[in-house]
């Protein structure tokens, strides 16, 4: 089967966004990219502090409420509909719930051919990137570095601790079925 979607999972500052841009460059066909960060940015600001939305704790923790979950589900269904209509889709996500988050995605994608990719990065390295970026809550990268991978099954895993995004993209691209 032809790969219709590539779903990358990794903690904050693991290097997913850079890999996505490199994948778009190295893959011969056009691939659309969507990330959980852009979903959050598309939501009204009140969703970023409301009890039912998404909350970023001072220690780097993230709490997800039912209103956020509902909108996230609608977003995922829309993205999957584009893949079913013929678009090739790359998803940049953070599976805060580990295996449960992957199962939610599985329920949306159904029988689509998906390449599941784990993007790992040492917690201390991710934390250093987080500090350099300056646009994340301190502690988020360290908290997410390992927990997002718990119980998740991948077709491909890459580690950005010592590898550049382009190297990781080439490794992932080798598993994409045209």
From Swiss-Prot:
Keyword Nucleotide-binding: yes
SUPFAM superfamilies recorded: P-loop containing nucleoside triphosphate hydrolases
The keyword Hydrolase is annotated on this UniProt entry: no
Gene3D superfamilies for this protein: P-loop containing nucleotide triphosphate hydrolases (3.40.50.300)
Name of the protein described by the UniProt record: Chloramphenicol 3-O phosphotransferase
One example of a Gene Ontology biological process annotation: response to antibiotic
Residue positions binding ATP: 10-17
GO molecular function: ATP binding; kinase activity
Pfam annotation, one family: CPT
Organism: Streptomyces venezuelae (strain ATCC 10712 / CBS 650.69 / DSM 40230 / JCM 4526 / NBRC 13096 / PD 04745)
UniProt keyword annotations, A-Z: Antibiotic resistance, ATP-binding, Kinase, Nucleotide-binding, Transferase
């Amino acid at each position: 089967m032809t790969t219709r979607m590539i779903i990358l999972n990794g903690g904050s500052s693991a290097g997913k966004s850079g890999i996505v841009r490199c994948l778009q460059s190295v893959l011969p066909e056009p691939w659309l990219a969507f990330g959980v960060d852009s979903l959050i940015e598309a939501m009204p600001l009140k969703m970023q502090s409301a009890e039912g939305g998404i909350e970023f704790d001072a220690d780097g923790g993230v709490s997800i409420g039912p209103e956020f979950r509902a909108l996230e589900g609608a977003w995922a269904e829309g993205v999957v509909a584009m893949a079913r209509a013929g678009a090739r889709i790359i998803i940049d996500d953070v599976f805060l719930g580990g295996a449960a988050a992957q199962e939610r995605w599985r329920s949306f994608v159904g029988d689509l051919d998906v390449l599941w990719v784990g993007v790992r990065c040492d917690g201390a390295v991710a934390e250093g990137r987080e500090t350099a970026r300056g646009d994340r809550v301190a502690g988020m990268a360290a908290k997410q570095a390992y927990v997002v991978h718990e119980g998740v099954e991948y077709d491909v895993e890459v580690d950005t601790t010592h590898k550049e995004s382009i190297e990781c993209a080439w490794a992932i691209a080798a598993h994409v079925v045209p």
